[in-house]
Regions:
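C-terminal/domain-edge helix-coil "capping" segments
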Residues: 27-86, 172-261
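Short, solvent-exposed beta-strand/turn patches at coil↔beta or beta↔helix junctions
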Residues: 48-63, 302-336, 355-361
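An acidic helix/loop motif centered on a single conserved Asp/Glu
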Residues: 61-80, 84-125, 164, 199-200
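Periplasmic peptidoglycan-binding/anchoring modules of Gram-negative envelope and division proteins
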Residues: 64-84, 318-351, 376-380, 418-423
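A short, hydrophobic beta-strand-centered structural micro-motif
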Residues: 72, 76, 90-96, 121, ...
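Short, surface-exposed beta-strand segments enriched in small/polar/acidic residues
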Residues: 86-102, 307-317, 334-371, 389-402
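Periplasmic OmpA-like peptidoglycan-binding domain that tethers envelope proteins to the cell wall
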Residues: 102-115, 288, 321-327, 353-423
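Alpha-helical protein-protein interaction scaffolds
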Residues: 232-300
Length: 423
C-alpha cells in the first residue's frame, strides 16, 4: 500500500504529501508462427470461446459483505490430512486493509469483527484465534481481505462509486489459498475513516509486507500459492498488528515495545514499524528518539524510491495550519527530508496533487503552488538542493482514493510526489 499535498473541503484542512517514485516497465516480444499448409487446414469450425464471467452486481453494503463471506466459508477446501475427526480448524484474521493505501479503517475493522462472529456462530468447523505471534507460529488458517474503492467500470481510477470486497482464506501449512470471496458494495453506510494509527502516521511508502498481502488477496484463486512477500513477513506483521491495537487504545509504551520487538525480527524492517516507533515516541513526549525514528522513516522511503509525508495546509493556501498540535513536528520533518535527500545526490521532480472537488484549473494551480512551496522549504534546509529539484502540479487527475470526501479518508489524494529523475 504516498503522502500528499492537497486542497481541503468544509473541514478547512488540507493535506500535503511528499512521494518519491520510480517506475520500470518492460514488454514481451511476439514471434509469428509459420503458416499452416492449405491441405492440413481443418474443415470444422472451431468452438466459440467462452465469454468472461460478468462481475458480481453492486449490492447494499451489508448484503455485499454477507455475499463475499458466505462464498468464502462455504467453498473453502479445508485440508483433511493430519486432522482428527470432528476437529476444528484454528483461524486467525490478519486485519483487513484498503487495497490501494494499505490502511485500516472503521469499515475494515467492523468487517473483521463481523467475519469473526460469522465463523463463531454459523461455521463451527472454524476456531477463531487472536492474530498474535504465538498463534501464527502454529501455522493456522489465516483470513485476509481488501476493501477498495472502484469507479463505474470497476477500476481503481477517477471518482469511486463503489467498493470491491475481496476475501481470501489461506493455509499457512501448505502455503496455498483455500477459498476466495468477492463482492461489490454501494458506499452508503460505509465509514472509510482511517484508524488512529494510520490517521496519525506522518508518512506513507510502499511496503513489501503490505504489497504481498494485497497480491495474495487480489487477482488470485483457490489453490494459488500465498505471495512470498506476505508469507515471509506474516510473523512480524502479527507483532505489528498488536502494536497498532495498543496504539489505538492509547497504550503508547506498550505499542513502542511491540514495534521495537518487530524491528528486531528478520522480517521486521517494515514501513509500519518505523512509523509506529516514531508515533509512539512522539506520543510519549520523547522528542529526540522521535526525530531519530523519523529519519529512519525518510531513509526507508528513499531506499524504496517513494515517500509520502503529510502536511496540513490552510484551505486554498500554501501556508501550514496554524494549530501547533498539528504543525509542531513539521520543521523537524522538513529538516530530515532535506538532509537525507541532499546527501543522496538525487534529482527530483516534485508533483502536487489535489482532491477532485472544485474547478480543475484551480486544482492544478493549487497543486503546483504547494509543490513549489515544499520545494522552497526543502531548499532552505539543504544548500545545493535547489538546483536538483523541479516542481509540477497535476490537480486531481491521479487520485488514489477518489471518494471526494476531503477528510482523513482520502488524505493521500492531497499529495506531493517526489520522483527521482536524471540530473
Amino acid at each position: 500500500m504516498t503522502t500528499v499535498f492537497r486542497k481541503t473541503g468544509a473541514a478547512g484542512v488540507c493535506l500535503a504529501a511528499l512521494c518519491l517514485s520510480l517506475l520500470v516497465t518492460g514488454c514481451d516480444s511476439l514471434q509469428e508462427k509459420p503458416a499452416t499448409p492449405a491441405a492440413t487446414i481443418p474443415t470444422t469450425t472451431p468452438a466459440a470461446s467462452t465469454p468472461p464471467a460478468s462481475p458480481p452486481p453492486i449490492q447494499a453494503y451489508d448484503k455485499a459483505v454477507l455475499s463475499a463471506a458466505t462464498a468464502l466459508f462455504k467453498n473453502a477446501r479445508l485440508p483433511a490430512e493430519g486432522m482428527p475427526a470432528q476437529a476444528k480448524y484454528p483461524v486467525v484474521i490478519d486485519p483487513l486493509i484498503d487495497g490501494m493505501t494499505g490502511a485500516q479503517s472503521v469499515a475494515t475493522q467492523a468487517m473483521g469483527v463481523r467475519l469473526a462472529n460469522m465463523m463463531r456462530e454459523q461455521y463451527p468447523q472454524f476456531d477463531v484465534k487472536a492474530f498474535s505471534a504465538a498463534n501464527v507460529a502454529k501455522s493456522p488458517l489465516v483470513l485476509i481481505g481488501t476493501f477498495t474503492g472502484v469507479n463505474a467500470e470497476r477500476k481503481t481510477a477517477g471518482p469511486r462509486s463503489a467498493y470491491r470486497i475481496c476475501l481470501a482464506l489461506a493455509d499457512l501449512r501448505s502455503g496455498k489459498l483455500l477459498s476466495k470471496g468477492l463482492a461489490f458494495a454501494l458506499p452508503d453506510g460505509v465509514d472509510p475513516t482511517p484508524l488512529a494509527f494510520f490517521r496519525d502516521a506522518p508518512a506513507w511508502s510502499e511496503d513489501p509486507a503490505t504489497e504481498g498481502y494485497i497480491k495474495t488477496c487480489q487477482g488470485t484463486k483457490a489453490g494459488d500459492p500465498i505471495n512470498p512477500l506476505y508469507l515471509d513477513r506474516i510473523l512480524a506483521a502479527s507483532v505489528v498488528a498488536e502494536g497498532i491495537e495498543a496504539y489505538e487504545a492509547g497504550r503508547y509504551r506498550e505499542a513502542l515495545d511491540f514495534y521495537t520487538s518487530a524491528l528486531a525480527m528478520p522480517s521486521g524492517d517494515q514501513f509500519r514499524v518505523h512509523n509506529g516507533i516514531y508515533l509512539a515516541n512522539w506520543k510519549l513526549g520523547r522528542r529526540q528518539p522521535a526525530e531519530a525514528a523519523f529519519a529512519k522513516v525518510v531513509d526507508y522511503g528513499l531506499k524504496h524510491q517513494r515517500l509520502a509525508v503529510k502536511f496540513l495546509f490552510r484551505p486554498g493556501s500554501t501556508a501550514f495550519m496554524a494549530n501547533p498540535a498539528l504543525s509542531a513536528p513539521y520543521p523537524g520533518w522538513l529538516k530530515a527530508i532535506a538532509k537525507q535527500t541532499g546527501e543522496s545526490s538525487k534529482c527530483l521532480e516534485i508533483t502536487g496533487h489535489t482532491s477532485p472537488t472544485g474547478p480543475e484549473p484551480l486544482n492544478e494551480r493549487l497543486s503546483l503552488l504547494r509543490a513549489e512551496a515544499i520545494k522552497s522549504r526543502l531548499a532552505q534546509n539543504s544548500s545545493g538542493l535547489e538546483k536538483r529539484m523541479i516542481a509540477n502540479g497535476v490537480g486531481s487527475r491521479q487520485t488514489m482514493v477518489g471518494n471526494g470526501r476531503d477528510d482523513a479518508s482520502d488524505a493521500l489524494d492531497r499529495r506531493v510526489e517526489f520522483k527521482v529523475i536524471g540530473c
